[in-house]
């Protein structure tokens, strides 16, 4: 039973383990205000961002944000966007934030795309 529990915990952490906040295309900044973490992303690429997936974990809490832009709504180079907020509850400290996927208007893609959200977006662009 312990082996199964360990496997479940390990598999649930894989997207965070394989992702990184060191994305050269989309910089994510987090700020804390009491028990709320605010995430802001900035397009650091030379091309507009069409889609992204960001995952944050703190303690046992995990949240995923995704965005796919319509034509004219792309995140232009240098622009920032509020990704979202996460209630940390009783946990304190900094969340582990991962950029799982980014897709640019020029066709460039970046990230391990380990979450279901990233896989769905990637499939959408292949059509």
Sequence positions of predicted segments:
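Short, solvent-exposed loop/turn segments enriched in Ser/Thr/Gly
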Residues: 31-38, 96
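Sec-dependent N-terminal signal peptides
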Residues: 3-14
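Short, hydrophobic/aromatic beta-strand segments
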Residues: 47-55, 65-67
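Asparagine-centered strand-capping/turn motif at beta-strand->loop junctions
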Residues: 39-48
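Terminal connector regions
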Residues: 64-68, 84-127
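Short proline/glycine- and polar residue-rich coil/turn motifs
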Residues: 71-80
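Boundary at the C-terminal end of the N-terminal hydrophobic targeting segment
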Residues: 17-19
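Detector for glycine-centered tight turns/loop "hinges" at secondary-structure junctions
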Residues: 46, 61-63, 78, 106-109
């Amino acid at each position: 039973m312990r082996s199964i529990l360990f496997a479940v915990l390990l598999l649930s952490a894989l997207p965070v383990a394989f992702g990184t906040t060191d994305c050269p295309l989309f910089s994510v900044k987090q700020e804390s205000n009491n028990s709320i973490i605010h995430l802001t992303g900035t397009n650091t690429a030379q091309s507009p961002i069409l889609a992204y997936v960001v995952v944050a974990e703190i303690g046992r809490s995990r949240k995923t944000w995704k965005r796919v832009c319509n034509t004219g709504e792309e995140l232009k180079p240098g622009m920032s966007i509020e990704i979202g907020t996460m209630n940390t509850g009783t946990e304190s400290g900094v969340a582990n934030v991962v950029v799982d996927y980014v897709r640019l208007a020029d066709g460039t893609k970046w990230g391990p795309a380990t979450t279901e959200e990233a896989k769905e977006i990637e499939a959408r662009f292949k059509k």
